[in-house]
Amino acid sequence: MLTRADLEAREAATLAPYATLSAQSRGREYPEAESATRTAFQKDRDRILHTTAFRRLEYKTQVFVNAQGDHYRTRLTHTLEVGQVARSVALTLGLNETLAEAIALAHDLGHPPFGHAGERVLDTLMAEYGVPPENTFDHNTQARRIVTRLEDRYPDFPGLNLTLETLDGLNKHDRAGLGPPSLEAQLVDAADALAYTAHDLDDGLRSGLLTPQQLETLPLWRELLARVPVQSPQLTERDRRTLHRELLGWLIEDLTTASEAAIRARGVTSAAEVRALPERLITYSAPMRELLHETGLFLREHLYRHWRVEMQVEQAARLLQTLFTAYLARPSMLPPQVRAQAELDGLPRAICDFMAGMTDRYATEMYAALVPTSGPVSWLGELRN
């Protein structure tokens, strides 16, 4: 049987000198006994996997509302894809796979129902009810709030008491004075963008909201077609899957190669040196960065702002606004634990935390119960699967 010490020794012997080692973790906010058989980052990963917040990701929107079809990505499938990409690249670069996976599994825990539409609504509502701008709503900040406080699983501390390395990896935007994060955290940021670019193109084609003819205006797509022998614009289901697989492989290869070159050029020899640098080292090649930038603009214009998606966004916004104002007007409708939290944090924050934890399905059911004359909420029916 391998002990924790054995696993830590294996890391020291096999990982790159710039990787983050479990044995060199800066610890946790609340001291606790180490596991005899798991590294510190293994404990983090396992704790995240067993949270209710993680399970709820299955029924939260990525782009398409969960009720619109069984085959579209959800926040859970997106999270798993990010974890797979992060582990794959970490293995090749000699980084700590387990730390990268832990950060990946937690990175979207703070997303509310209905994706970014839900985030915008909660942020706006919090501001309207007097919450300072720095404390309104952001899904990255909410992820940290979940793992440091809201998940109530242990008697000795609030939250999950994750290592400081995993928590730092969730500090995606608010890094004033902190410098770049670990290479593992940088990798998760890149894997996140990689995964949603590839699967949003795939889901857009599957749904019929994007067409092969539209995509042929996109430089990334034209280069992809040059790599894969398919007969565009008449794409079969197998063609679409082949293109998605090839795109993932191409992006991962570019990310791995460019990052390895950047690390080598900087000559870093420790994780501490990485954190002292002014720039990030996990990166794409310059041509790929330009292709991805153009693709992001294309997706924003043709998928995220498609009239059917915009209709879904408006439906979600009205639903969440109705729930929030109803709970604010009549707090007695809230569960007891939410009312108890309101005494500590104020009613708007408690409602925000409660609603951010809802799934698409639960929020829709609460709305139907609150406004029974509205009938079942229709999300424009199923899109093409």
Curated annotation (Swiss-Prot):
The keyword Endoplasmic reticulum does not apply. CDD domains: HDc. One of its GO terms (biological process) is dGTP catabolic process. InterPro entries: dGTPase, dGTPase-like, dNTPase_2, HD/PDEase_dom, HD_domain, PHydrolase_assoc_dom. Transmembrane segments: none annotated. Gene3D superfamilies: Hypothetical protein af1432. Belongs to the dGTPase family. Type 2 subfamily. NCBIfam families: dGTP_triPase (TIGR01353), PRK01286.1-1 (NF002326). This is Deoxyguanosinetriphosphate triphosphohydrolase-like protein. The lineage of its organism: Bacteria, Thermotogati, Deinococcota, Deinococci, Deinococcales.
